[in-house]
C-alpha cells in the first residue's frame, strides 16, 4: 500500500506565513493564512491514506532571514517533520547587498541540515510589490532577493514556489488593507499553488480570478492606510522594535489536524465538486 509522504508539516517564516491579512486573523489567528490552509489540504490528503497528520507553524511576524533560519530552524530540526516550508526575505528586501552573502549562507545551511534529516523542503521566493506605486522602489531589490532564494534552492534541487512571477499580486484584491500582507484570496491561492507544487490531489475552492472585485481605493483609503499602517510601521523603526516582539508562534509544536465537518472551509478535488471538509487543529 502506498504511503503518504507528508504526515507532518512545519511552516517557517514571518507575518506572511503567520497568516496576517487573512479574514478574522485579528480576532483569532488559528486556522488562518496560507500555511494553515496548506496544512488543511495535507490533512485531507493524509486521511485518504488512512494516516494521521500533524502540523506546527513557527512563523513570527517581523522576523528576518537570520531570525527565521536560526531559532525557528532549530525548533523544526527538533520536531523533525516530513515537510518544511520556508518563506522568508520580506523583512530583508531593503537590506544592503552586503547582507546577501550571509543570507545565502544561512539558506544553504538550513536546506542542507533539513535534507540531512530526511526532511522535504519547499522554498517560497519573495513577492513582486507591483500592486501600489509607492512600492516601485522595492521592485529591483525584491527581484534580487527572489533570485538569491531561487539560486540556493536550485543548488539543492529543492522545489520553489514562485510568488514573484504571479500577476495576481499586481491586483489590490489579493492584498489586505495594509498592502503588505495577503488577503484571504491571496492566502487561498498560495495554499493551492503549494499543494500543486507538492503534487497533492486536494485544492481549496477559489473564486474565479475575473470575478474578484477590486477594492475601492481613493483619498480616504490612502489616508486611512497612512494613519493605521504606515505611521505605526515607521514608529517601530524609529524605536527599533519589531511587530513580533513578545509574540509567540501560534503552533509551537506538532498538533493533530484532521478533516472535520465543522471546518471553516471545504476541500475540492481538481475537476470535481467540494466534498471533503477542511482540517482543523485539535486542542
Segments (PLM) and residue ranges:
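Serine-dependent acyl-ester chemistry module
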Residues: 90-101, 128-144, 232, 273-276
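Conserved catalytic region of serine esterases and O-acyltransferases that act on ester linkages
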Residues: 155, 178-181, 185-283
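Solvent-exposed loop/turn segments at secondary-structure junctions
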Residues: 15-18, 61-65, 90-94, 127-131, ...
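Alpha-helix N-cap and loop-to-helix initiation/capping positions
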Residues: 26-33, 98-103, 136-144, 178-186
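A general structural detector for well-ordered alpha-helical segments in enzyme core domains, enriched
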Residues: 34, 72, 103-110, 145-149, ...
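Serine-esterase "nucleophile elbow" of acetyl-processing enzymes
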Residues: 1-59, 73-80, 270-275, 279-282
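Substrate-gating cap/lid alpha-helix
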Residues: 131-164, 184
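Internal alpha/beta domain cores that form substrate/cofactor-binding pockets in large enzymes
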Residues: 10, 39-45, 49-79, 84, ...
Amino acid at each position: 500500500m502506498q504511503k503518504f509522504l507528508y504526515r507532518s508539516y512545519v511552516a517557517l517564516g514571518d507575518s506572511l506565513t503567520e497568516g496576517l491579512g487573512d479574514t478574522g486573523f485579528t480576532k483569532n489567528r488559528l486556522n488562518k493564512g496560507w500555511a494553515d490552509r496548506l496544512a488543511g489540504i495535507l490533512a485531507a490528503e493524509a486521511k485518504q491514506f488512512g494516516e494521521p497528520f500533524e502540523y506546527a507553524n513557527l512563523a513570527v511576524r517581523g522576523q528576518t532571514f537570520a531570525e527565521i533560519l536560526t531559532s525557528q530552524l532549530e525548533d523544526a530540526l527538533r520536531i523533525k517533520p516530513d515537510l518544511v516550508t520556508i518563506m522568508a526575505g520580506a523583512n530583508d528586501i531593503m537590506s544592503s547587498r552586503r547582507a546577501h552573502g550571509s543570507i545565502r549562507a544561512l539558506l544553504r545551511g538550513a536546506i542542507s541540515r533539513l535534507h540531512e534529516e530526511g526532511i522535504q523542503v519547499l522554498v517560497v521566493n519573495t513577492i513582486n510589490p507591483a500592486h501600489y506605486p509607492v512600492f516601485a522602489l522595492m521592485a529591483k531589490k525584491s527581484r534580487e532577493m527572489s533570485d538569491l532564494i531561487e539560486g540556493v534552492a536550485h543548488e539543492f534541487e529543492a522545489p520553489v514556489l514562485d510568488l514573484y512571477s504571479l500577476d495576481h499580486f499586481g491586483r489590490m484584491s489579493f492584498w489586505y488593507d495594509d498592502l503588505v500582507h495577503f488577503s484571504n484570496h491571496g492566502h487561498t491561492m498560495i495554499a493551492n499553488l503549494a499543494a500543486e507544487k507538492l503534487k497533492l490531489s486536494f485544492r481549496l475552492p477559489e473564486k474565479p480570478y475575473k470575478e474578484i472585485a477590486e477594492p475601492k481605493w481613493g483619498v480616504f483609503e490612502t489616508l486611512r492606510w497612512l494613519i493605521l499602517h504606515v505611521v505605526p510601521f515607521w514608529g517601530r523603526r524609529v524605536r527599533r522594535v519589531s511587530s513580533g516582539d513578545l509574540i509567540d508562534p501560534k503552533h509551537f509544536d506538532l498538533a493533530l489536524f484532521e478533516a472535520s465537518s465543522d471546518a471553516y472551509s471545504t476541500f475540492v478535488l481538481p475537476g470535481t465538486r467540494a466534498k471533503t471538509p477542511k482540517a482543523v487543529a485539535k486542542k
